[in-house]
Regions:
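Short, conserved micro-motifs composed of acidic
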Residues: 20-299
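Bacterial Sec-dependent N-terminal signal peptides
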Residues: 1-22
Length: 299
C-alpha cells in the first residue's frame, strides 16, 4: 500500500536541512500526540487574526507565518531566537510596505519564498518573491515568478532541493486553482508548467506542499472523494515523472467544509494544520493511520 511509503516521506524532512541539526524547541509546548491541538497560543495563534503557513528554519532559530484580519490584507510575521529566548512576533521587514503571505524556506535555509502584491495596483494580485539570507540578516526582496496575467494570482510557494518552486495559480475569474512548477536554471526560473494531478475528474487544486526530493505532493483540492468543499490530499510521483491520483487524508483532517493543506516540521515529527483562523498541530503518525484507511489498494 502506498500509505506505508509515507513513512519515508516524513522521515526525509529530518534530513532536508543538508546536515544542519534542528534545534527548534516548539516554544516549550507539550507534545499534542495524535490530537489536533492549538499551536503556540498568543505566540503564533494570535487573537483576532487569521494565521497560516508556518515556516520554521531548518535549524530552528527563526519562524515566519502569515497573519491578518483576512485575505488579501495579510502580513508575514517574524520570530527569532536570540540568547535562548524568542522575540515577540513582529512584521517582517520585507512585509512592512505591502501585503505578503504564505512564507516557505528553501530546504537549505538560504532563501525564504513568499507571495506578495508588492508594486501591484490590485492588492489581490499576488506574485512569488524571495529574500536571501545574508549573514544574520535577510536581503532585499526579489520577484522571481510572475505569470503577468492580471486575472491569475500566484500563491503558496514550496521548494525542492533542486530549487524547483511548486505553487498555486489562482484564476480570479473562474475561482479555480491549479498547481504549477517552475525550475531554477542558469540563475533564473523557467516558464511555469502545469502539474497534472487528476485525469478523470475536473476540480481545483491549491496550497501545495512538496517533498524536497519531489516524491510526494500535498494539496488542498476539490472533486475526487471530497468530504465537502476543499479537502487535503497527497499525490505520489511515478518514475516517469507523472503523478498518481490524489489520496484523501480522511476524517481526521477533512470536514464537510473547506480544509486547507498543511505544512510539516523540518524534523518530520509534526503536521501544522490551518483551520478556524488558527494554527493547529499533531504528530505525523496520526496522518499515517488516516492515510492507511483511505489508501486505494488498486493503485
Amino acid at each position: 500500500m502506498k500509505a506505508v511509503a509515507i513513512i519515508t516521506f516524513f522521515m526525509s524532512f529530518a534530513l532536508m536541512s543538508n546536515g544542519q541539526s534542528l534545534q527548534f524547541d516548539y516554544f516549550g509546548i507539550k507534545n499534542p500526540g495524535e490530537k489536533n491541538e492549538l499551536f503556540a497560543p498568543n505566540v503564533v495563534s494570535l487573537k483576532n487574526f487569521n494565521e497560516k503557513s508556518l515556516a520554521i528554519s531548518p535549524i530552528g532559530d527563526e519562524v515566519f507565518f502569515s497573519a491578518g484580519p483576512g485575505w488579501p490584507e495579510c502580513k508575514i510575521m517574524y520570530i527569532k531566537k536570540i540568547n535562548n529566548k524568542w522575540t515577540e512576533p513582529k512584521v517582517a521587514e520585507f512585509s512592512i510596505d505591502c501585503f505578503t503571505t504564505e512564507p516557505a524556506f528553501s530546504p537549505d535555509g538560504k532563501y525564504l519564498y513568499y507571495s506578495s502584491s508588492k508594486g501591484m495596483q490590485d492588492i489581490k494580485q499576488y506574485c512569488i518573491w524571495r529574500v536571501e539570507k545574508i549573514g544574520n540578516n535577510w536581503g532585499a526582496p526579489k520577484k522571481v515568478i510572475d505569470i503577468a496575467d492580471p486575472k491569475i494570482w500566484e500563491f503558496h510557494p514550496t521548494i525542492t532541493k533542486s530549487g524547483t518552486v511548486y505553487f498555486c495559480c489562482w484564476d480570479s475569474l473562474k475561482q479555480v486553482g491549479n498547481i504549477y512548477q517552475s525550475k531554477y536554471s542558469d540563475g533564473a526560473y523557467t516558464e511555469p508548467e502545469k502539474v497534472v494531478l487528476r485525469f478523470d475528474i475536473q476540480g481545483s487544486d491549491t496550497d501545495p506542499f512538496v517533498d524536497p526530493d519531489e516524491k510526494y505532493l500535498i494539496t488542498s483540492s476539490t472533486g475526487q472523494n471530497s468530504k465537502g468543499g476543499y479537502d487535503t490530499y497527497i499525490s505520489y510521483k511515478k518514475e516517469d515523472g507523472s503523478w498518481l491520483s490524489p489520496i484523501n487524508f480522511g476524517d481526521k483532517f477533512n470536514t464537510i467544509g473547506d480544509d486547507n493543506s498543511f505544512d510539516i516540521s523540518p524534523d518530520g515529527r509534526f503536521l501544522f494544520i490551518y483551520k478556524q483562523d488558527d494554527v493547529y498541530w499533531t504528530e505525523t503518525k496520526g496522518a499515517l493511520k488516516s492515510l492507511r484507511k483511505n489508501d486505494d489498494p488498486n493503485e
